[in-house]
């Protein structure tokens, strides 16, 4: 069939009439200098502070320094392919990460990209990594306990939902173990956990993930990992990415626990970026806004009031000290921002007291309102007992002739230290903690040899579970203590069958 010339011309005419010239205007700049994860870009006249920009190879950057003639950009990815003269485009977006239920059980990097080899994330929801903290009137005071499963913490420095509790100590004193145990203990507590690993070895993160998986804790945990091999900008944004993921759950009325492991490495990464961007250094070469770096992050942890759904974010930031010096710059900053600190001491750790919590320097500024009634009653005198024991212990080294009252205090102190010891990855439920602490504080362990205390505890708690489960049930349901007679009867019945070791 021949096509007529008129038809062709009519077709061309209609195509020409319908043609729309689509023109897009993009603000572009040129890289004038690049190195160490920082690019200096000329142009980008209308760029916003904190805006994402895109390099020619698809790598994103974050506009940080807005100067008269150029923009300092931190590069969020590999920077070896970026060279002088490359084009940089504005995106008009600020930094956002994917959020939602789909992230639970996954390991992601600070950009929200999965790194666990289990395929893409099926979520379309995102949140900006920087957002203002909730206001004063949107909050509510902390009144619900967050059970860590660690006796020394739940009894001496209780943590509440919505609190910020700093965990501080030298390297290799068991800080990460405290966090992992706390996450494991949230199994049936309807909590979502976010573990942010900043500047950790890949192998360490792998071990933590495998521990969580083995105990079934990955079913309610998101792991955000910015390992030591990542460029500094990713270490800097990792905590903000983690808290953005947590906020999505908090504003939907859920309770979240977020662990930052650790903020010292984030501060060091931020110092590196600031020095490369030629910002003036201050104390310990940190930039002037290193306090704001952490305060704006930790203020996003809150307990919301009921009109906003009553959700909460509880933050456990970690800070690593050098030789136990808690008066350095970053430790003092974070201590002043948080609602208390748990100080892990290397001397205690090496002497076999684990978790190595120094009860004298550790404090919770929320205190009793984050404990159930039963725990408040049994743990009331525990801190004082421990403090007086530590004081007497140093005196007792010099003199052997001690009066009976002092001897009794020392003996009780030794048993207190033994009871507060705990193996890793074995968190205890609050009913079991209350039961053993009752036996300790009421003097029922005074006739048990010190070397038998740990065995007595394990066997006694197992015996109560089998022969007197009503004790655990009453503590769980009423949050109060059962009658003294019930406890005493159970303790005495077990003591009759307990085999003390020969002294």
Swiss-Prot record:
Keyword check for Translocase: yes
Pfam short name (any one): ATP-synt_ab_C
Parts of the chain that traverse the membrane: none
Annotated positions binding ATP: 169-176
Domain of life, per lineage: Bacteria
Localization (cell): Cell membrane
rRNA processing is among the record's keywords: no
InterPro entries xref list: ATP_synth_asu-like_sf (IPR023366), ATP_synth_asu_C (IPR000793), ATP_synth_asu_C_sf (IPR038376), ATP_synth_F1_a_nt-bd_dom (IPR033732), ATP_synth_F1_asu (IPR005294), ATPase_a/bsu_AS (IPR020003), ATPase_F1/V1/A1_a/bsu_N (IPR004100), ATPase_F1/V1/A1_a/bsu_N_sf (IPR036121)
Listed NCBIfam families: atpA, PRK13343.1
Complex and partners: F-type ATPases have 2 components, CF(1) - the catalytic core - and CF(0) - the membrane proton channel. CF(1) has five subunits: alpha(3), beta(3), gamma(1), delta(1), epsilon(1). CF(0) has three main subunits: a(1), b(2) and c(9-12). The alpha and beta chains form an alternating ring which encloses part of the gamma chain. CF(1) is attached to CF(0) by a central stalk formed by the gamma and epsilon chains, while a peripheral stalk is formed by the delta and b chains.
Protein name in the entry: ATP synthase subunit alpha
Name of the coding gene: atpA
């Amino acid at each position: 069939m021949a096509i007529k010339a008129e038809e062709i011309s009519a077709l061309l005419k209609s195509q020409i009439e319908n043609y729309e010239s689509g023109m897009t205007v993009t603000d572009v700049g040129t890289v004038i200098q690049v190195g160490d994860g920082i690019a200096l870009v000329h142009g980008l006249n209308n760029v916003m502070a904190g805006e994402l920009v895109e390099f020619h190879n698809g790598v994103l950057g974050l506009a940080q320094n807005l100067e008269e003639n150029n923009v300092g950009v931190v590069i969020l990815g590999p920077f070896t392919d970026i060279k002088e003269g490359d084009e940089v485009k504005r995106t008009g977006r600020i930094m956002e990460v994917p959020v939602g239920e789909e992230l639970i059980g996954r390991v992601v990097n600070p950009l929200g990209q999965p790194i666990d080899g289990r395929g893409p994330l099926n979520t379309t929801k995102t949140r900006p990594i920087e957002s203002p903290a909730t206001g004063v009137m949107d909050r509510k005071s902390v009144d619900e306990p967050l059970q860590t499963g660690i006796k020394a913490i739940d009894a001496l420095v209780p943590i509440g939902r919505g609190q910020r509790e700093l965990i501080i100590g030298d390297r290799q004193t068991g800080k990460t173990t405290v966090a992992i145990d706390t996450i494991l203990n949230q199994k049936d507590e309807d909590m979502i956990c976010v573990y942010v690993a900043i500047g950790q070895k890949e192998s360490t993160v792998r071990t933590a993930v495998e521990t969580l998986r083995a105990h079934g804790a990955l079913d309610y945990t998101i792991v955000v990992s910015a390992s030591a091999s990542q460029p500094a900008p990713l270490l800097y944004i990792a905590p903000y990415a983690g808290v953005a993921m947590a906020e999505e759950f908090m504003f939907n009325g859920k309770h979240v626990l977020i662990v930052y492991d650790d903020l010292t490495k984030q501060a060091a990464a931020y110092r590196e970026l600031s020095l490369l961007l030629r910002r003036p250094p201050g104390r310990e070469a940190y930039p002037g806004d290193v306090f704001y770096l952490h305060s704006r992050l930790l203020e996003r942890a809150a307990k919301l009031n009921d009109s906003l759904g009553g959700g909460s974010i509880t933050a456990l930031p970690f800070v690593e000290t050098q030789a136990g010096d808690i008066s350095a710059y970053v430790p003092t900053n974070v201590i002043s921002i948080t609602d208390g600190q748990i100080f892990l001491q290397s001397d205690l750790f090496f002497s076999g007291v684990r978790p190595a919590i120094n009860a004298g320097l550790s404090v919770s500024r929320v205190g009793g309102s984050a404990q159930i009634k039963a725990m408040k009653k049994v743990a009331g005198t525990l801190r004082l007992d421990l403090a007086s024991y530590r004081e007497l212990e140093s005196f007792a080294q010099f003199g052997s002739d001690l009066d009976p009252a002092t001897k009794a205090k020392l003996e009780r102190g030794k048993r207190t230290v033994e009871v507060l010891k705990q193996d890793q990855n074995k968190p205890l439920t609050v009913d079991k903690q209350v039961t053993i602490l009752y036996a300790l504080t009421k003097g029922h362990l005074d006739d048990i040899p010190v070397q038998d205390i740990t065995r007595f505890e394990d066997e006694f708690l197992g015996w109560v579970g089998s022969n007197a489960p009503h004790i655990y049930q009453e503590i769980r349901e009423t949050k109060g203590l059962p009658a003294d007679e019930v406890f005493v009867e159970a303790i005495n019945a077990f003591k009759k069958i307990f085999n003390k070791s020969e002294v």
